Structures are given as structure tokens and as C-alpha cells.
From Swiss-Prot, chain B:
Gene Ontology terms describing biological process: autophagy; protein transport; Rab protein signal transduction; regulation of autophagy; synapse organization; vesicle-mediated transport
Chain positions found as Cysteine methyl ester: 213
Underlying gene: RAB39B
Listed GO MF terms: G protein activity; GTP binding; GTPase activity; myosin V binding
Upper taxonomic lineage: Eukaryota, Metazoa, Chordata, Craniata, Vertebrata
Protein name as catalogued: Ras-related protein Rab-39B
Keywords: Autophagy, Cell membrane, Cytoplasmic vesicle, Golgi apparatus, GTP-binding, Hydrolase, Lipoprotein, Lysosome, Magnesium, Membrane, Metal-binding, Methylation, Nucleotide-binding, Phosphoprotein, Prenylation, Protein transport, Transport
Lipidation (S-geranylgeranyl cysteine): 211, 213
Quaternary structure annotation from Swiss-Prot or TrEMBL: Interacts (GDP-bound) with C9orf72; C9orf72 in complex with SMCR8 acts as a GEF for RAB39B. Interacts (in GTP-bound form) with PICK1 (via PDZ domain); a PICK1 homodimer may allow simultaneous association of RAB39B and GRIA2 to PICK1 which is involved in GRIA2 trafficking. Interacts with isoform c of RASSF1; the interaction is strong. Interacts with isoform a of RASSF1; the interaction is weak. Interacts with the DLG4/PSD-95. Interacts (GTP-bound) with HOPS complex components VPS39 and VPS41.
Organism: Bos taurus (Bovine)
Amino acid sequence: MEKMEPSRQEVQPAACKASPPYSLESLSKKHCQNQGNLLHFDRQAPGRLTTSPTLRRLRSRGCGSVRGGARGTATAHAPPQHVALEVRTWCDLQEYPGSASPLSNKCPPESEHIWYVCVDTSRFYEHRRSSVVLNLPGLEVFPGDLLVSAGAADYLCHPLLLLNSESKKPRWPFSKRGVQGKDKNKHISDLEDCLSSLKITDFRDYEFHTLKIFMNTLKYLQTHEYLLDVDLWRLFANLEELSQTSFGFVNSLFHIFKDYVDICETSPSLDFISVLTKYFRGSLCQSHQTYCLNYSAAVFYLESLKQRHDFGIYLKWCEQHDQCRRLHLPELLVAPLHRLTRYPLLLKNIWKRSTDSTEKIMIYSIKEKVEKAIQDLEGKVKWLDNFQKFRHLQEIVVWPPLWDRDKRFFIPECLKHIFKEHMAENILSPTNRHLLYEGKLTLAESTRFLDVYLFLFDDFLLVTKTKRNKKVKKLGGSDPGLMCPSLTAELQTVIREGGSCTVIDQPIPLDRLLVRGLDPLHVSVFGLRNAFLIQHENRYRQCIAAFLLQAQTENIKRTWIAQITAAISRFTKSQETKKLSSFPLPAEPSGI
Amino acid sequence: MEAIWLYQFRLIVIGDSTVGKSCLIRRFTEGRFAQVSDPTVGVDFFSRLVEIEPGKRIKLQIWDTAGQERFRSITRAYYRNSVGGLLLFDITNRRSFQNVHEWLEETKVHVQPYQIVFVLVGHKCDLDTQRQVTRHEAEKLAAAYGMKYIETSARDAINVEKAFTDLTRDIYELVKRGDITIQEGWEGVKSGFVPNVVHSSEEVVKSERRCLC
């Protein structure tokens, strides 16, 4: 999976054409002199974006004239209620020779930095809220984009803060920076201050705008050196790109309809098929796929981040925003997924209503394509899940050497090299087998009860005993965010505590396994409840191992027996067909 | 001060494709029936207040799963944040009835450790002449899984209100008895909302603790 690569461009803060006192030249000069000695804050400056109802009222009374965007790009696309928006693009800079500001000098020319800054400063002059527009080279201001305080301008070009270049990005846990105790409180209150200096545009009905509020707020905080160790990509993946592609799609479609309505005499046909084709055959599905593939991992990562106080403050701040409609980040993250799954339904409706036969065929094939993309995605998600799960299993399942497994076997030190086993990697490889069922049970031994964890694969059953290790933390276990979301809660606890699952006995092949539920009357004598017996037979049908297992409830016991029985019969069947047919089985389609 | 709603319940509507999930939700939340369903892009869920007793309102947040029927590995994440669900099948489509079991198994795995209350809904009951599933067998299946069974029609607005309010009432009883509790980090049940406290974003920060009714 490739990360989103911003286009390579030099950093050039955008000029504020419309409001002369904020010309970039003067701004940059003053920036280098002294931050505290900055420009006057004109609350009613026409170029200033605001969410303040008072200000909007003032403006609507006629003091602020509506200004179109430079190049007429973004504002033209924006719905009418967004007219107060002033968009500046880097093209404007050409008109400002003085724009070679110290800001851009700070940045190496090869930087991948992508921010555009339109400044309206006051932060250091008075303690009022102020705003800066962070803009992207896509030349549009997206709704939900942030207005951030002017102080951000100083940080925007800092090479350490280039959010998209992994190598340069510092990963400082706060503890390393000595944020503890008193400092921690200060850190939190600083974070709150930082958030309070931030405002969000109140534009609605855009492409995943609520999600972008979260993403951009986080970006903003990171430019202020908060939450630097939070991985933006792991949370939001390619949201930026996805949002732009979706926006482009909706926008083109809207324009075609608009043109059709406006000049319907000259263009009798409504050619929206070309737009559908362009986007659905283009990057729209791919962008969604990339996002969705990351989705479950993102939700999991979010869960682990929620434990942090500073992250919690950030989340609350965003969630309290009106536009989030009392929704929380986990449910907002799912939005692009919903979108993708609705496209086939919409296309089907268009197909139904279409009267032109060639058009119908085109729409149908586009619909098929999207459905195929979804099916592929489903397959990929499953594959990835399984792959990651097995990787973790390889880590936590421990195979003790023969002499440790059974004390009968005496292997002198000098012979041990013969028994080097590479079992774990081969036997727990995702390409060879599937994990069907797993769970915690209690194994009754002659003198004690043992906590065991069973893995039922499609060809064998593995009985392991769980070992907790609360002192030593394994590297993989220290960051719960790195863990696989598809692992069961029990295994996650084991990993978190640096524990392991030690194999008790050799794997039991399903064709050598017998399972029987035990009559409650029989076993209650021994104080056993919900028990069942697993026997391991050798090639000669002699029993070589037996496990008396106890489940927490009768239901769990029944499920286990049913699962094992079903797995056995499936395995036997597949063995038979393998014997019967000399041809290899056809490859599974990606969706299964 | 009287709360606008006592609780917010999140419900999901599941079942095979074309059983009429979206239509049922639309009928309930918008009071209309669209001959051709138009999935609204950008609308992730629908909301409606339900009065279960005089003065006692519950806000329902209903998530439509239309289009996601074959996309389960990735949508399962939000099953777990629902407290209740309507499991739909089409009474004129035997197959959709046979899949009910599968749907239940699927959800059961993914809602853990929380629980979810289901009602089995036989939809499109206006098409009685084309019926392929008898009421008797549907009731038997529902009983086997401890669910209620109800037959609805979005087109003729039969039992749509009842399906949702009965489910809401059942969940409410469980919440009242303490069998279902509000939990941090779980979206299934949320506490109520009291009006006239929140005016602006600044105040939201201060009055973020909501009334626990």
C-alpha cells in the first residue's frame, strides 16, 4: 500500500490580495522581526473567514462585499452560502515579487510541503481568535478545512513537521520530552489553548467534510507540536486524496446537470455517462479501496489512542462541533465505506430509468465494475486480516523443543542441533491453512486445572497453554496499536502482557481426532461442568493423547463440539476429493 | 427540565438485498414510500423520535445496510455499536428467509461482548398472493431464536410503526432493568439530551456532561 504522496512543490505562502494591510511582503518581514509585533487585526476584513454569527450578520448587512475566488475556481464550485470565502492560489504569487518570504526560505526546495497560507493575524497582538487558511495545491478550499491561528504560519515550513515524509517526522512520545506531572497538566492546558485558537468553517454537505474536520484539526495540532506521535496515515489513510477525487466527481456531475438546465436548447442530450465513466473507471474506486483497506486497522488504532488524555481532548473538541451531529470519530470513519457500497445501488437506479439502449449497457458495465471493485476489496480485506492474524500467531505460539515437551527424551547438548525445528513459520503460514475457530478453555489434568487456548485450523487442532508475562514486555506487544484487530480479545490481552501460547502437545490432525461431549451426570462426580473430551489417535487408531476440556458455559461447549465436528467432516471430504481428482483444484475467486 | 429524549438507541436494519430495508426505514422516518428506491449518498443514518409512553421519548438512530450485504468483512465493525436490529426477509422470497439464520450467526460473532436485540420482520406483506413463507413457520423460527415476529409493508404502511416501537420498547425495558447499560465507548445506548443548555461552541465545552435521566 502506498502512502499518499503530495505533489512536489516549493512552499509559497499565498498572498492576501484583497486585504492590503496583510500583504505578504509586510507579513513576512514582520514575521522575521518579531512575532509579537504583528499586524492589526481587522475582524471585519472581507478576506477573513469566520463562523461568528455576529460577523456574518454584519457582513450580510452590506459591509463586506462578496468576493469571488482568484481564478474563480473554488468559489465557483461552492454552494451559494459559502460566498464569504476568499480563495487564493499560488498563481497569485506571481504577481507578488516580494513573496520570497523567510517562510519559504526556511524550507528546503525539495521539500514536499504542501501548505498554502493565507494569513490574517492577531494572535500575538490581542487575545482574540484569528484565522489562517490552510490550503492545498488542488487550488480549492474544501469545506471543513481549518482556519488556524496565525502562529501556525511559523511552524508550517518547519522540516520536522512535514507530515507526509515519514523519515523526517519525529516520533516523540511525550514522556521522552519530560511531560510528566505538573508539566503534563501544563501540556494539556496548552493543548486546550491551542485548540481554542482554532476555528472550522461551517460548510456542510461536502465530501466527507466531518472527517476532514478531524484530520485537519490533528494536522493543525501537529504543526503546533502536539500529538506528534499520532500517525495521521494510520487513522485517515488517503482521506485527503479520496475527498478530492469524490469532490471532483460530484462537482463534474453537478456542472453537467447545471449546464443542461441552463442551456437546454443548445445541448439536448445530457452527457453524464462520460463523467461516470471517467471517474468510475478512473481513480474513484481505487481511492475508496485504499481507504477501506485501512479502515479496520484505523478503528483499532483509534481505540488504542483513546486511552490517551491529550488525544481524548482533541477528539472531544472535534466531536462537539455542530457539523459532527453528535457522532463520534469511529462512526464517521465508516462514511467512505458507505459511500462506496451505495454507488452500485445508485447506478442501478440510473440504469433502470435510462431509455437509451447503448446508455443502458454503459451504465450497467460501470455498475458491474464498481461491484467487482467491492468484491475485490472484500477479498483483500479478508486476506489481509488472515495474513496479519497468522503473523501474530507465529509470534505468540511457542513450540518447545522435544526434550522440553517430554522429559523422557534425553538429548545431549551435542545432538540438539539435529532437532532444530522450523515448525512455527511453516505450520502457521497463512497460505497453507485457515483458522476456523479458537478460544479459551480449561484443561483438567490429574492434579490441576490449566488455562488453555485452542486453535482449530482447517486441518488440525492445536492445544496451547497461555502464559502471562507481566514483567517483560515484548517489543511487538508494547504498542497495542500495532496489533491485529481481528485477534480475539483474549489473545490481545496475552500479547499486551507479553505472554505467549505454548504448545502442549503435537498438533492433532483432524482425521485422527475424536470429539465427544460428556454426559453431565458422568462428569459432575469429578466437579467438571460443560466438559468434552478430545482424543488423538495414531495411524493405527490407538489413542495417544486425550484432553478433558471444560467450557465456561454449556453453549460454548456445544459450539466447540459443533465446530470441530464440522471441520472434521469438511476435512475428510476435501481429502477424498483430493484423492479422486488428479487435477488441482481451481483457484478461488478473489471475493471468497 | 424535561428531556427531549431519554435515550438514544442505535438500530441496524439487516437482511438480504432487495428485501426492502431502505423502503422500510424511509417509510418509518419520512412517512413515504418510494417506488424506485433512491439511496441517498451522504446520508449514513436516519433518525426519528419515538414516544414509548406519554412524555417518554426515545431517539432512534437507524443505520441502513443496503448495498453492504456482500461486503461484510468490512462492515462488521459497526454491528457492535448497535443495541437493536430489524432482521428483514421478504415473504415472497423464500431464499431471504432461509438466510435469516446466517445473518443471526454473523451478527452474533461481531457484536460481542455487547448484546443486540433483534426483531424478525417479514416484509412486503401486502403481496400476500405471492407469499412463499407462511406466518406460522416464521413465527416458529423467531421463537427458536427468542425474537418477536412481525409482518410489515412499507408500501401500504402496515405495522411499520409497530415494528420499530415494539423493538424500542423491548430495549427500553432491558435498559430500565439494567440488563443493558450505557457504556463508555459504546454507541448502542446513549443518555438523553436536555434542551436550552447549549448555545454556542464555547458553552458546549463547559456543559459537556449531559443529563443522565
